[in-house]
């Protein structure tokens, strides 16, 4: 879901495709071709699982629903099944949509979602199909089915069977359901043949729905207000999936590949993300947002909780003691509430904020161009992927070129670094900054120097500011920004800060071994100190300097 068809050369394509006299011949051609993409074992397991001796015959919806773990989510199943029934007509989207799903149809869906299988299915320079486009086609298909007579396969593939994509609007509610469902797969479907347990994600469905809303808020401004009336343009969704949500495709493919295994053939899989809790800021749903926000070159397979402000205390020293021993990449999550009226908040609620305002240069009112989403939402959440170990940096900064700032609520935005050394951890009063210059600290006077795109936190971890004044700093603008020169800043009260250690099995094993050794060493030294103290006290008692109601003294 999310990649578009490329634009191949017409002459080459027309020669590479077989010729057809009728559209029924095209459907039969792909039905025959799709079976050849699977092994004999896979087809046998598929037929057994769905009682599909004849692949032309309809499959019981209940069996498909159970296989996709959607039996407890009727609304999601309705949206997913509608998409499957449309895709089974591939590539003829103007064909009437059937009321049932056939064996051939379901196999085609499995192949379309899988990159390698799809390349073999179409056998052209078109490398991928955008399934998001099909979500809004259902209303057009019956209307146009008698008008489209084309049998030119090259044209059909390039134009989605001559569909006018620009005119398609996808219902907002359907988009939210499908995106929320896809997000649940990130933490629940790790491989193509693992046993899946989605009961926890279903129980916390509203969290995934909230994450889906953040993504919808980014896709189109029409997501706010009357989106249910007019829908969201398919072109906007296509652009979003091609940029920020391409990482969801493998997880959906993993799930549909499950249909090629018998239930007894699925294997146990250790959930490497079982330590994520719906009580933390980094919930499973926010983790899914982080995954789709990171560059494809970055993978996070395991996480280790290092620091939680609400548990360990909001201080630079506490964060340093918990995080600095981790010698691998980390993920910092910052959540808070936007301050809508600086003067009112500083005067009536928190006088310390007045000092922060003095230290942090505000944008001029004319430059404050917050969009409708941010003006109507109070909660904000940011994530920062830190690709180097933390260190005290009162003069120099640290960080390599994979540093990434992500906004997770109320929108999904990603800002990737374009240079090295973009972060500081200033222990002399400057706090934490990503994308900013080192603050000027003179005695009790602090002056922050925010970058064009930057996230800044004061030394008490009480206030934060995300600033965006366009390109030109250490971070690139978001891929989905229609106007990347737009300036705004979001000032907020920090409610929680979390830092998680990232890495694969090898990195995590080494880090955990080191942490366990350090904790054991600290306890050993504590024992030695207590023993030494006991011995010293006994010696003093022997010479009569302490004990017997004496408190000690000089000799």
Swiss-Prot record:
Keyword terms of this UniProt record: Cytoplasm
Keyword Membrane set for record: no
Domain TLDc as annotated: residue spans: 280-503
Disulfide pairings: none
PROSITE patterns: TLDC
Alphabetized InterPro entries for the sequence: TLDc_dom
Keyword Ribosomal protein: no
One of the Pfam families matching this protein, by short name: TLD
GO cellular component, one term: fungal-type vacuole membrane
Compartment list: Cytoplasm
Function: May be involved in a process influencing telomere capping.
Similarity section: Belongs to the RTC5 family.
Protein name: Restriction of telomere capping protein 5
Organism: Candida glabrata (strain ATCC 2001 / BCRC 20586 / JCM 3761 / NBRC 0622 / NRRL Y-65 / CBS 138)
């Amino acid at each position: 879901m999310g990649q578009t068809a490329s634009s191949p050369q017409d002459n080459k394509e027309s020669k590479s495709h077989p010729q057809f006299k009728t559209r029924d011949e095209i459907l039969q051609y792909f039905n025959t071709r799709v079976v050849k993409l699977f092994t004999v074992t896979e087809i046998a397991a598929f037929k057994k699982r769905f009682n599909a001796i004849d692949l032309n015959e309809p499959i019981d919806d209940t069996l498909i629903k159970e296989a996709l773990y959607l039996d407890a989510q009727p609304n999601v199943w309705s949206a997913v099944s509608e998409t499957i029934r449309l895709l089974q007509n591939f590539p003829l989207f103007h064909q009437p949509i059937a009321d049932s799903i056939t064996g051939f149809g379901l196999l085609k869906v499995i192949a379309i979602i899988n990159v390698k299988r799809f390349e073999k299915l179409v056998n052209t320079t078109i490398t991928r199909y955008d399934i998001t486009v099909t979500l809004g086609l259902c209303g057009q298909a019956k209307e146009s089915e008698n008008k489209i007579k084309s049998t030119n396969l090259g044209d059909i593939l390039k134009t989605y069977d001559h569909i006018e994509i620009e005119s398609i609007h996808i219902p907002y509610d359907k988009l939210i359901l499908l995106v929320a469902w896809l997000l649940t797969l990130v933490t629940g479907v790790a491989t193509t043949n693992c046993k899946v347990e989605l009961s926890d994600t279903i129980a916390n469905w509203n969290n995934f729905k909230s994450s889906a809303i953040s993504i919808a808020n980014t896709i189109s401004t029409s997501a706010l207000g009357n989106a249910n009336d007019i829908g969201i343009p398919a072109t906007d969704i296509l652009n979003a999936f091609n940029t920020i949500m391409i990482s969801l495709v493998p997880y959906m493919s993993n799930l549909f590949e499950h249909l090629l295994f018998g239930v007894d053939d699925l294997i146990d899989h250790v959930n490497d993300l079982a330590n994520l809790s719906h009580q933390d800021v980094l919930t499973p749903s926010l983790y899914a947002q982080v995954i789709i926000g990171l560059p494809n070159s970055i993978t996070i397979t395991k996480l280790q909780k290092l620091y939680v402000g609400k548990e360990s205390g909001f201080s630079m020293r506490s964060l340093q003691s918990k995080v600095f021993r981790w010698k691998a990449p980390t993920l910092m999550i910052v959540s808070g509430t936007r301050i809508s009226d600086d003067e009112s908040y500083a005067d009536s609620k928190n006088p310390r904020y007045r000092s922060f305002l003095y230290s942090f240069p505000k944008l001029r009112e004319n430059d404050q161009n917050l969009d409708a989403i941010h003006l109507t939402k109070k909660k904000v959440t940011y994530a920062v992927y830190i690709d180097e170990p933390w260190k005290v940096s009162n003069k120099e900064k640290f960080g390599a070129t994979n540093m990434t700032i992500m906004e997770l609520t109320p929108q999904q935005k990603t800002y990737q670094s374009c240079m090295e050394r973009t972060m500081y951890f200033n222990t002399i009063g400057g706090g934490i900054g990503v994308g900013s210059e080192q603050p000027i600290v003179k005695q009790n006077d602090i002056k922050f120097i925010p970058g064009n795109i930057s996230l800044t936190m004061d030394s008490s971890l009480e206030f934060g500011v995300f600033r965006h004044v366009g390109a030109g700093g250490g971070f690139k603008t978001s891929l989905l920004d229609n106007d990347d020169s737009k300036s705004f800043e979001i000032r907020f009260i920090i409610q929680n800060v979390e830092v998680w250690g990232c890495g694969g099995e090898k990195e995590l094993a080494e880090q955990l071994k080191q942490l366990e050794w350090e904790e054991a060493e600290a306890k050993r030294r504590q024992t030695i100190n207590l023993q030494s103290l006991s011995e010293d006290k006994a010696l003093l008692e022997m010479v009569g300097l302490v004990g017997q109601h004496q408190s000690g003294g000089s000799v």
